[in-house]
């Protein structure tokens, strides 16, 4: 005899508060664990954190901050193609081993031109070149600081005598020595014919020493990804982002297991075979295999777990996050396709669980939305500082460009949009560096308890299912908290 349970219920759905990791024999100290992992098939991370492609989470400032900590940010798409490409370019220029395409100014230009370029690119010096890109000199803000004639030719104020340069084979250690010996901050790199081929700055060398865990490409630039939707101009947007230097493209939709998304994935892989394409969001192993078979370089897992997402309530659809992550992890065995666990993370312990269930890394939104580097508006409420945070399925975000993520791109009337998210505020949390420090600390601690020296070893950890009483027991209880911890707040605070 058939029944609803026998015929319709195909799996138990568990999420973070339903389970705990079982401690195991360990020879691993938290400070010695290895956090290296992968974001996508060809992109490694030094910490398993990815900031979400949300318009109140990740623009260039956030992407720079998370990359310096060892993760990667995904620039959101709720802006014009030009502006999104510019945000990517800002990240790629933020740090360099050697700047391979430095901003230059041609001889004959004026002081006003140089000042405008310095303001636009936030730089303090510009190499001066002729029409054939021969290095003629360098102009810095020191040269221009007291110059009153804005129409004066740059040739008259630039430094050109005794100009210190180096060749392409110079490593950063040797470059640092040259900079120190000559008391200069910028070192032009030229070829044998005197053509400018790059620029090494003292600031970049200092940053590299200060942030040895930073996530960088083979040229020493910070890595960054960028989100796109499934629209008529997706390939045009991708082209602009790739040209700007994006290390990966994330096809970001509410339902990645759909024909339109898979067709766009195929187009993207055909048009950009040398760049990693990440696709999401999904919640089943079947979806993961289909995306992997069609060329996805990573998949993003999570339908409805986010704090600002209402998909499960509005549409009645989703899979509790830990079950979804494990189902996808099992399906991807043998494919070399990493899994990004996206959403539902409130504490560092949730991150440990998400990775133990099969995640290669986690995508974070609310955990960093309250930081200094997030683009959300700062709000003062009842004497406390907050930052705005909204789901990309909220009415406000959909009005600004995320309608296509929820397959409503053709809906012109705002009143006819069906949102799958809300807008709100989160407490101000300080800097990204401070937040990531605590999250990394919690992850290291969890790995130590499980005896897992690496992310891959953490995948072998076992869980125990708990009751509501177990959840209550897990949190501080029978006490009034008088001093807040930087990594804990009560549920629903």
Give residue ranges: language-model regions.
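Bateman/CBS regulatory modules and CBS-like beta-alpha motifs in cytosolic regions of diverse proteins
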Residues: 33-45, 52-54, 83-121, 128-130, ...
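Catalytic cores of alpha/beta
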Residues: 61-64, 236-244, 277, 283-301, ...
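Short beta-strand/loop segments at the ligand-binding rim of alpha/beta enzyme cores
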Residues: 44-51, 97-102, 161, 217-227, ...
